[in-house]
Amino acid sequence: MEKTFIMLKPDAVQRGLVGQIIARFETKGCKLVGMKLMSVDQALAEQHYAEHKGKSFFEPTVQYIMSSPVVAMVWEGKNVVALARELMGATNPANANPGSIRGSFGMDISRNVIHGSDSVASAEREIALYFRPEELCDYRKAGEEWLSE
């Protein structure tokens, strides 16, 4: 089954939005298989955003992600990467659909409350950065048979 990496950024944690955002994934039938509240250090932040090194927003993004705890999660489900992208909405909350996570909670392009993998390959890379294999739970979710064929 496909997995994706989701991070609730410092603004989501500080504003007390964690439960509301998790509920959106659960309501859509996604299965939570890994989660941790953690502080991101410089090395991990730079690894996570390595593809943006050299861009003007790289350093501010690294500093921001280190400014307060984040919630790192792994979700599983059918086409979960695309589903998560739809739930999150456009990166800039001003362009996000009303009702999407960023449309509902995002303040601006920097403080948009959530990060999600943009592809299966990115999900694999990001999951490996934040979780050891033994930290992910393999289980059958009650009612799972009602959520996909």
Swiss-Prot record:
ATP binds at K9, F57, R85, T91, R102, N112. It comes from the Bacteria. It catalyses: a 2'-deoxyribonucleoside 5'-diphosphate + ATP = a 2'-deoxyribonucleoside 5'-triphosphate + ADP; a ribonucleoside 5'-diphosphate + ATP = a ribonucleoside 5'-triphosphate + ADP. Its cofactor is Mg(2+). InterPro entries: NDK-like_dom (IPR034907), NDK-like_dom_sf (IPR036850), Nucleoside_diP_kinase (IPR001564), Nucleoside_diP_kinase_AS (IPR023005). Its main location: cytoplasm. The active site is at H115. Major role in the synthesis of nucleoside triphosphates other than ATP. The ATP gamma phosphate is transferred to the NDP beta phosphate via a ping-pong mechanism, using a phosphorylated active-site intermediate. Belongs to the NDK family. Homotetramer. This is Nucleoside diphosphate kinase. It comes from Desulfitobacterium hafniense (strain Y51). The gene is ndk.
